Amino acid sequence: MPKKCRHLLQTSDLSLDEIKLLLNKASVYANDFNAVSLETKEKMHNKIIVALFFENSTRTVSSFEIASLRLGAKIVKLNMQTSSTSKGETLIDTFKNIHAMQPDAIITRHAFSSAPFKLAEFSQCPLINAGSGMSAHPTQALLDLLTLYQHFGGLENLKGKKIAFIGDVKNSRVANSNIKLLQRLGLEIMLCAPSSMLPSTPLRTTHNIEEAIAFADILMSLRTQTERHNAPIFASLKDYGNTYCITQKRLSTHAKNKEIIILHPGPVHRDIDIESAVLEDKRSKVLEQVKNGVAMRMAVLEFLLSD
């Protein structure tokens, strides 16, 4: 095991030059998943990566698994519902036991915001945060940035662009990571949600989706995270969607004189977060985000493991 290693717990762990390096490498992989150099394949060939997901995941865990395999590494994905944590073993003890088996990297997701930072204290191999509570999801922010980088033609073209986050911003680790990263790159940010879904923030906010659409070059829709709510905020998700769904009508009325793109980290609540017709529209970049998830996670794993 390496004596020194890098972790990726939040986007601030990366310098701007490192972010540019990841974007360049991920762009190559997004264009061709098989464009892995022989040198990289040789370095990754005997690497063993463990995925410890204590929360459900479809896109993130699958894309990390595919990214690992495309690089030539092996990945062990543990089912935490059938692990010893269900018998009362603590998070720290589970991690220490897996760590004792000397994997080359560990990818973790947990409901507690502090979990990856605590685990990093014990880790002598690269630790990647695949989502921690409401705090951080760095690889999601990086793949979203890759999607913007591709669409607008480089980082230099992102400065001054306007992005509106619409939905459950307060409970979204995706929004939190994206906001911190995009602020570093000079984007203007607006948050749009009912009061109960907005964090305390100096950023510009609105309760009006029409205002957000008129403001933005980029819309980032967010799922309503009812599992993190102490009490119902709306009578139903349909009632929420009536007020905050991104629809063709709203776009044609309030974004008719400009190009606008729409992102969502998934899972999408169709006709609640985004109207089905909008999801199929060329302005929707949702499936590009999914593809870019594999490419960016390939770049991240290569960056952390190609020693």
From Swiss-Prot:
GO cellular component term of the entry, any: cytosol
One GO MF term: amino acid binding
Record-listed carbamoyl phosphate binding positions: R59, T60, R109, H137, Q140, G266, P267
Pathway terms, separated by semicolons: Pyrimidine metabolism; UMP biosynthesis via de novo pathway; (S)-dihydroorotate from bicarbonate: step 2/3
EC number from the UniProt entry: 2.1.3.2
Residues holding L-aspartate: K87, R173, R223
Major enzyme class: transferase
Keyword GTP-binding: no
Keywords of the record: Pyrimidine biosynthesis, Transferase
Transmembrane residue ranges: none
Record Pfam families: OTCace, OTCace_N
The reaction(s) this protein catalyses: carbamoyl phosphate + L-aspartate = N-carbamoyl-L-aspartate + phosphate + H(+)
Classification via InterPro entries: Asp/Orn_carbamoyltranf_P-bd (IPR006132), Asp/Orn_carbamoylTrfase (IPR006130), Asp/Orn_carbamoylTrfase_sf (IPR036901), Asp_carbamoyltransf (IPR002082), Asp_carbamoyltransf_Asp/Orn-bd (IPR006131)
GO biological process, one term: 'de novo' pyrimidine nucleobase biosynthetic process
NCBIfam families, A to Z: asp_carb_tr, PRK00856.1
Family stated for the protein in its record: Belongs to the aspartate/ornithine carbamoyltransferase superfamily. ATCase family.
Subunit structure: Heterododecamer (2C3:3R2) of six catalytic PyrB chains organized as two trimers (C3), and six regulatory PyrI chains organized as three dimers (R2).
Primary role: Catalyzes the condensation of carbamoyl phosphate and aspartate to form carbamoyl aspartate and inorganic phosphate, the committed step in the de novo pyrimidine nucleotide biosynthesis pathway.
Name of the protein in its database record: Aspartate carbamoyltransferase catalytic subunit
Provenance organism: Helicobacter pylori (strain G27)
Lineage: Bacteria, Pseudomonadati, Campylobacterota, Epsilonproteobacteria, Campylobacterales
